[in-house]
Amino acid sequence: MFISGLENGHTTEAPFTFAIKNEDINPVDYEEISNIFRPGHADYSKYVKYNGNAFKTGGGIFSGRMTAPIVVAGTVVRDILLKMGIMLESKIIFGESGTGAKIKVSVHGVKAGVGEPFFDSFESEIAHAMFSIPAVKGVNFGEIENLYNKKIEDIYEEYEIKDGEPKLKHNYWGGVDGGITNGEEI
């Protein structure tokens, strides 16, 4: 439910506020395991950080339920980006074991020159946001999974002029050089 910041399908000057009611709350389900540190969960790390004073009922900031508000915010941002001529495509690639997946995201329409070198690089800002999503364990840009083991001469990148603009022949590095976008697909 949208509380403020949205009116007649448009954002307003008010802070963007929404609420998602969790109707699947059942703390009893967690009673038997409330004193067990579950692998793959934040049980132990939050126990240490907060001196044992943290949710033991599956809720709280470490819950997978925290993905829901990120999805809502992402939907609003996607619509804003579309109006700016920036389009996102995504594809889920499931692992054979069924225990995980990759999400491939391609971004088109980002102009060259976005980002900063070093700590505020385009990649570091995106990675920072991605790692805020529960269960994300890695972020790659470009074709790094296919290229890390190749010789540099096999992946040498060159610019060519297309339609009067410099364009990369291959775009191996995913549209970002030196932390700054180069106008290619990300």
What are these regions (language model features)?
Residues 1-186:
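Generic N-terminal targeting/processing segments that precede catalytic cores or assembly contacts
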